[in-house]
């Protein structure tokens, strides 16, 4: 099973991790946090899942990665980064290489193969062999303007043109790709209750974001302090998520709190909605320190 294979890779490389079947399947942490969605067919990953994964990753400063075996049309090749709704998408072997510090140099995007080259290295190598920008452009089959732009800043270049440049200049120019994603649009609270809780936390000085397909649905941040929270009127819904919230909090080293309308006994700090209006941010911090 693919999920087990990925967890084995994580264990062998010293990661602590937990599972949740939502916008991510594995939250893993060593020096930093990775949020992994694991699917045999990566085309089954939906845009709503991607938006929630982006929001969660932005707030946690985590790396979101979609790991799979194939699309509907082809198998995923190793050492190539694919793209699905702006989430870096890789094969299991590529993930293992990334964990070992070996980042791919090829991006598959919208049917094309792209790379990035080092601008300073390109200019230096061109000058070392005595070629003008026009000379190099002619040999590679691109425009002089394109050579100028690639010497000025990092830009995507068609992979085959990057290979031609390296062959012409007899040096390595391609650089490892960063695991980038686009920023997520704000996700609105889905209920009046969630909106009221968010309003109370904002009054205390917290910035709040909502995220779904996750064991919790609200993230609250104040300066360098951050907490994850499951906010729901019904405690039976929260009780289903408690083990996942606890594990996620332990793995990511983020404080967790539960907010509901009813009394609930659990291993996570809890607050009732009617307690919030009289609280300040320092009260929240004190509550979390006691746990």
Model-assigned labels for residue ranges:
Residues 39-90, 215, 231-275:
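Catalytic cores of nucleic-acid endonucleases
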Residues 82, 126, 137, 166:
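The alpha-helix within a helix-turn-helix
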